[in-house]
Regions:
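Short pre-active-site segment immediately N-terminal to redox-active cysteine/selenocysteine motifs
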Residues: 59, 66-69, 138
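Short, internal strand/loop/helix patches
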Residues: 110-148
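A short beta-strand-turn-helix
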Residues: 35-60
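N-terminal targeting signals for export/organelle localization
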Residues: 1-42
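Structural microenvironment flanking redox-active thiols in thiol-disulfide oxidoreductases
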Residues: 74-116, 128-132
Length: 172
C-alpha cells in the first residue's frame, strides 16, 4: 500500500485535497485569490488570536505552509527557529490549511505548535487560499516575500537554515 501511495506521487497538498475537497469557486478563500490574504490567527506561543495579513504589510515575510500530520513540517519549523533571531525585521508566519473542528481543535493546533517550538504568528486557512496563492504543491512549503509583498523565493520540501539565510539575505 505504501509503495502504491508513493508511486501515485501524492504530495502533502494533494493529500489535503483528498481529505478536504477542492475549494468551491464561490468560497471567498478559494484558490482564485491572490496576495495578500487574510488568515485567522490562533492564541499560541508568539501568536495572538485574531487575523493577520499574509504576507505581512511593509515587511519581508517568511511564509511557512504546513500540516500537523506532516512529519517533514516539524523539520521545517526547526530550520525557521534557527534563523529567526538573525532577522529581527522579517515577519515569520506559519499557516495550516487543515480544517479546525471536530478532529483538530484550536487547542490541538496550539499544543502541536508549542511541542514543535513555534514562536511566531500561527494562522489557519481552511479554504487553501494561501496555499493556492503561493502555488504550493507540497508540504512543507516556504515562500519569502519582500517588503512590497512580491514573492522572491519559494521552496517545496524542507528548506534548510542555510537555504533560508541565503534567500533572506536578498531581501534584508
Amino acid at each position: 500500500m505504501l509503495a502504491a501511495l508513493a508511486g501515485s506521487g501524492l504530495t502533502g497538498a494533494s493529500v489535503w485535497v483528498a481529505r478536504n475537497g477542492v475549494p468551491s469557486p464561490g468560497d471567498e478563500d478559494a484558490a482564485s485569490g491572490g496576495l495578500p490574504r487574510t488568515v485567522e490567527t490562533l492564541d499560541a506561543p508568539g501568536s495572538t488570536a485574531g487575523t493577520a495579513q499574509v504576507p505581512s504589510p511593509d515587511a519581508p515575510t517568511v511564509v511557512d505552509l504546513f500540516a500537523t500530520w506532516c512529519a517533514r513540517c516539524d523539520e521545517q519549523l526547526a530550520s525557521m527557529r534557527a534563523v529567526r533571531g538573525d532577522y529581527p525585521d522579517v515577519s515569520f508566519v506559519s499557516v495550516t490549511n487543515e480544517r479546525v473542528g471536530d478532529t483538530l481543535t484550536r487547542g490541538d493546533l496550539a499544543d502541536w505548535w508549542t511541542a514543535n517550538g513555534g514562536e511566531w504568528t500561527l494562522g489557519v486557512d481552511p479554504g487553501s487560499g494561501v496555499l493556492a496563492a503561493f502555488g504550493a504543491n507540497a508540504l512543507p512549503f516556504v515562500a519569502i516575500t519582500d517588503a512590497d509583498g512580491e514573492i522572491v523565493a519559494t521552496h517545496s520540501g524542507v528548506a534548510s537554515a542555510a537555504t533560508l539565510r541565503e534567500r533572506l539575505d536578498t531581501v534584508t
